[in-house]
Regions:
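Catalytic machinery of carbohydrate-active enzymes
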Residues: 1-319
Length: 319
């Protein structure tokens, strides 16, 4: 490992972070750390098309580059990535640490490239991350590149990109429920009927309930609303910025292990993540000023009362 990675104001950094949304949000701390450590450096982010627009709004990067993560047999895309990685970067910080980015180091990077990551043979290897939260993993990597570890993660860049909840004429106070998550892992979903029961209990305490999700979550969100018809259904109707603005003003947010819940925690909203056996809280618990998690094996074992008990520790409006 290099004794020091002090980078001059004229040097160039490349940060690799592909996604998904939760992974991007957990990287905010590392992004801020690198920018605070190198306030005048040129810092580029390599990410996927899905997050290029969001990354372009971030205050930490001078340039956003797109990686389509094409198969290796796509010669044109592979050569494009090779040309990119062969540019005179002073340091490449791999925050994805995937098999794909390991191949990037092994086959595409310059032989003498300074590379922070977990791939064998890189110049600045991260320590063993077994049992370490994903947020902290990226903070450690940023620290190896002389990031400022106590840098403030200012979310105004995202929150100011959307109208406040009052401008949307939403009732207050309100709770946000996130009933969806990856369709590939239904075992990570708390049952829709339990979300509906939670919504009804919250409404009985004079809290409005707002349901959110992507278009892919529409079926489960609609099912929740059918059983808790007083809920407001905003599924598929919010941008990431609008979702963040909705979350930050919420009395509480409850949802599965999915990107919007990490976003809620990052805004400082009182947040509860519901976990099943596929989620290891040591590695994947959300980070934020007021967040918690509760796990069931299977997730269907989690009771509505269990969730309400956790909420009572985060907000005064749930009794």
């Amino acid at each position: 490992m290099h004794a020091s990675l002090k980078i001059s104001s004229q040097q160039r950094l490349l940060v690799i972070k592909h996604g998904a949304l939760g992974d991007i949000v957990q990287g905010f701390g590392a992004f801020a750390s690198l920018r605070h450590g190198h306030p005048t450096a040129h810092i580029s982010l390599l990410t996927t098309p899905a997050f290029a627009e969001l990354a372009g709004m971030m205050p930490w990067f001078d340039q956003v580059l797109v990686d389509r993560r094409a198969p290796v047999i796509n010669i044109a895309e592979s050569l494009s990535i090779r040309r990119l990685l062969r540019q005179p970067w002073d340091i490449i910080i791999d925050l994805q640490c995937s098999r794909r980015t390991a191949r990037y180091f092994q086959f595409f990077a310059r032989p003498n490239a300074r590379w922070v990551g977990t791939v064998r043979g890189c110049s600045d290897p991260c320590p063993d991350f077994t049992g370490v939260n994903n947020y902290q993993r990226m903070m450690v990597a940023a620290g190896l590149a002389d990031g400022v570890l106590d840098a403030d993660v200012d979310m105004r860049w995202l929150l100011q990109a959307a109208q406040p909840a009052e401008a949307q004429q939403l009732p207050t106070p309100y709770s946000v429920l996130v009933p969806g998550c990856s369709l590939a892992k239904p075992q990570k979903r708390w049952p829709a009927e339990k979300f509906a029961a939670l919504a009804t209990r919250l409404q009985a305490q004079n809290l409005a309930v707002i349901l959110v999700g992507t278009a892919a979550d529409r079926a489960v969100v609609d099912l929740v609303q059918s059983q808790a018809p007083a809920s407001i259904n905003l599924c598929g109707k919010t941008s990431i910025a609008e979702l963040a603005r909705l979350m930050v003003a919420a009395d509480s947010v409850v949802g599965n292990d999915t990107g919007p819940v990490f976003l809620a925690a990052a805004t400082g909203a009182p947040t509860i993540m519901l976990m099943g056996p596929d989620t290891d809280p040591a590695m994947s618990a959300p980070t934020g000023a007021r967040c918690d998690w509760i796990k069931g094996t299977p997730i269907t074992k989690l009771a509505v009362d269990d969730v309400l008990d956790r909420l009572r520790g985060l907000t005064r409006n749930v009794t």
